[in-house]
Amino acid sequence: MNALGRHILAEIYGCDSNILDNLELIEDIMVQSAIVTGAEIREVAFHKFNPQGVSGVVVISESHITIHTWPELGYAAVDVFTCGDDVNPWDACNYIAKMLRAQNMTATEVKRGVFEKPVKVVNY
């Protein structure tokens, strides 16, 4: 089986609540997670909720990296979806968990676009 991409769904617990509620820090961590994996950043959008929490996306040429935080619970939901073989989504997940000072992370990898035969994707 051949997959177009790998999608990591990460549950990150025991995080520093001050980091989880800081828009600038979360945005920086997410952008840096793309940089350390060698991904090409296309767009960045983040939002701070009232009274707490941050959500955001880093759109990368290889797909996306997203986060939704619950500071009151010390929890972050993170998705990292990468296409191709050049960027390892696990590197981004592990970097994010480390920077959030997480006590625990559980994650599942889903293969996306699974074909029985190899497919050729045109890159523009």
From Swiss-Prot:
Q: How is it modified after translation?
A: Is synthesized initially as an inactive proenzyme. Formation of the active enzyme involves a self-maturation process in which the active site pyruvoyl group is generated from an internal serine residue via an autocatalytic post-translational modification. Two non-identical subunits are generated from the proenzyme in this reaction, and the pyruvate is formed at the N-terminus of the alpha chain, which is derived from the carboxyl end of the proenzyme.
Q: Which residue stretches, if any, does this entry annotate as coiled coil?
A: none
| Post-translational modification Pyruvic acid (Ser), affected residues | 63
Q: Which GO terms describe its biological process?
A: spermidine biosynthetic process
Q: Which residues form the active site?
A: 63, 68, 83
Entry cofactors: pyruvate
Cofactor note from UniProt?
A: Binds 1 pyruvoyl group covalently per subunit.
S-adenosyl-L-methionine as a keyword? yes
- A single Gene Ontology CC term: cytosol
**Short name of one Pfam family for this protein?**
AdoMet_dc
Q: Where is this site: Cleavage (non-hydrolytic)?
A: 62-63
What InterPro entries does the record tag this protein with?
AdoMetDC_C, AdoMetDC_fam_prok, AdoMetDC_N, S-AdoMet_deCO2ase_core, S-AdoMet_deCOase_pro-enz
Q: Family membership, please give it.
A: Belongs to the prokaryotic AdoMetDC family. Type 1 subfamily.
What is the purpose of this protein?
A: Catalyzes the decarboxylation of S-adenosylmethionine to S-adenosylmethioninamine (dcAdoMet), the propylamine donor required for the synthesis of the polyamines spermine and spermidine from the diamine putrescine.
Q: What is this protein called?
A: S-adenosylmethionine decarboxylase proenzyme
- Give the organism the record lists: Thermoanaerobacter pseudethanolicus (strain ATCC 33223 / 39E) (Clostridium thermohydrosulfuricum)
Q: Which lineage?
A: Bacteria, Bacillati, Bacillota, Clostridia, Thermoanaerobacterales
